[in-house]
Amino acid sequence: IAAGKDLTVGTTKGQLNIAGLRNTFTGYISKGKLDELQTTLNFMEKQQVQYDQEIANIKLDIRALEAKFPRGGSFFRKRIILSEEYFNQNPSDKIAYDSLRQKLAFSEKQLEKIKFDIQATNESIKLIQNPAAGHEHKSAVLSGQNINLLSAQGINIESAKIEASKQANLQAAGLLPVVSEEDAKQGEMRSAINIGGLFDTYEYGQRSSNNYAYMIFNQPSEIYGEMGVNIFAPGQSADSRIVINASDIISDSGKVTLKSYGDLSLTAGQGELYTYNKHSYTKRSGKLKIKKKTITEIKEYNNVKPDASLLSGGKGLDIQSGGNIYAYATLFDAPKGSINLTASKALKLFAVEELNYNKLESHKKSSFLGITYNKENSSNSKKMHTALPSKLVAEAVNTRSGWDTLLEGTEFKTSLEGATIQAGVGENA
């Protein structure tokens, strides 16, 4: 729906649903997803070059600083002496040296992660060019100047794009339906406003066959208001929650404001790539080719990556909850404004794990005239677990909670006042 001026969509009795359309297919090659993956790969390869250069520059700075350090050892094997006495006499060198070492460790860790991501994206590009079975979603799109989504009950948005040239306003006076027993077992709870993505899936081959693979990508919801985004759940119920899952809430020139009477949850989705390939071949040797070696190779690859939510406000972020605030690997971005997180109860920012697993097995069986005389088995695997943290980028960051504040692997980047974190404040302290 495209409106030249303002657009208001509302319900007076039931809930408001806005969702993408699902397209199921077999034998389909997704040109759109291929282009998207190629764009992602190009971006990551540029990042890799930047980190390579950054690491090289840091190492040069470290060597330049180390040239000032005292030396010891033999004439032929000089070595640097990092003595406590030297650093006590030159505290600025100690600070500079420690800082450079920390920067180097961080950059090397980021480079390793980017290399794994590039590997996963290359694998995805290879796969996506083959016919697949699965489904994709076409996002629902609403555009206008001021967009108002109002509901007497709840608001449910799945894989939709809301684009307002002025403000985007969402308000739910009531609640969405009670979640099913199965969903409740998965940790889902009733809410007033739910904003999330839908999964696109691509499957290749049959399970338990020698060649099998699948890919899962999140198709997020995106809510954009140039002059501001306001999302309110004011209903006086503990279930009056706002849940944002693997989606983007953005205002380039305004503020993003989220307020809920109940809990406010910012959760991450999960993209995944899995491939399995089993291949056997035979080598013969000897004058009569009567010696036979049968080789079976099994390659298995799995990449599981969280799809985080993004909250970005040109003039800041104001997030308030009458209950708890839970954020999983969320990016809070307000480089020219402040970030305010206020929870009447607990405030918890979690990291979410990413998995990269690579395994190669080789089984060799040697035989002569049909009699097996030797077997060799080898296995080489590499597993990398990393945690994608919640990240806050702003001129100032202020967090307040009535109960506990938990910051798990959280990254802060502030340019002016820094970060203010308070626990045990407000009426629930």
Regions found by a protein language model. Give the residues of each.
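Low-complexity, glycine- and small/polar-enriched segments
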Residues: 1-429
